C-alpha cells in the first residue's frame, strides 16, 4: 500500500511542478504583452506628435513654401553637412534634416527596435506619410498615406566616399522597409556630390567618379591644372554645393 501512496505523491508533486511552470509562463507572456503594448503606445505617441515637427525634431531646418508640389527634403550626413547645405540651399523650397550617429539596418532589425530609434522616428515625423508595417502587433501604428507626404522629392545627400555610400544605403533600406511606396512612386532621389574639382586657367570641372576624372584630364592634355578631392559635404563651399548638388537647374 505504501508504494501506491508514494507514487500518488510523486504524481501530485509533478502536477504541482507542471502547474507552477504553466503559471510562470503565463506571467512571462503577460508581462511581455504589457511591455510590447507600452512600447507600441510610446512609439505611436512619438510618431503622432508630428504636427509641430519643427520644434520636435532636432536640427530640422524647414523651408518657407507650404506648396507640397515644390517642397524638397534633403536628408544629409551629419552636422557639418547640415551647415554647408543650409548655406547652399534655396530656403524657399528646400528643407534639410541631418542624420546623426549610426543608422540602424532596418532590413535586419525587429520593428520594436526600429521604432525605438530616434533617427528613424525623426525621419518618419518629418516625412509625414506614416509607415507601411507588415506586422499584426504593429498594424495600428501611424498608417501609411502617401497624400500626407510633405515633400515632392526626398533627396538623400551623403559624402561621395565609402562611408557616405554606406549611410545612403542604410537610409534607402529604412525607406524600403517602412514606406516602399515612396520608392515605387519615384519620390526618393540620390543627390550626387562630386568627388573631384579640377581647375585649369579660368575653368572648373567636377568629376563624380574616377572615370570622369580621367576623361577630363585627358581633354586637358598639356594644360596646367589643379585637382582637389572632396573631403566631404561639410568641407564643400556653398557655391559649389549649390551648383553641383542642390540647384535643380545645374545638379545631376
Kindly label every feature range from the protein language model:
Residues 31-51, 103-106:
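Amphipathic alpha-helical
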Residues 46-73:
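Flexible, glycine/threonine-enriched loop-and-boundary segments that flank and lead into catalytic domains
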Residues 1-11:
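Single conserved hydrophobic/aromatic residue that forms the stacking wall/gate
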Residues 75-77, 151-162:
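Acidic beta-strand-to-loop metal/phosphate-binding motif
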Residues 10, 39-43, 57, 88-93, ...:
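Short secondary-structure boundary/capping segments
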Residues 15-39:
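Long, highly charged low-complexity segments enriched in Glu/Asp and Lys/Arg with interspersed Ser/Thr
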Residues 57, 64, 170, 181, ...:
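Charged C-terminal transducer/switch regions of large nucleotide-driven machines
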Residues 12-20, 69-146, 166-172, 180, ...:
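Metal-dependent catalytic core segments for phosphate chemistry
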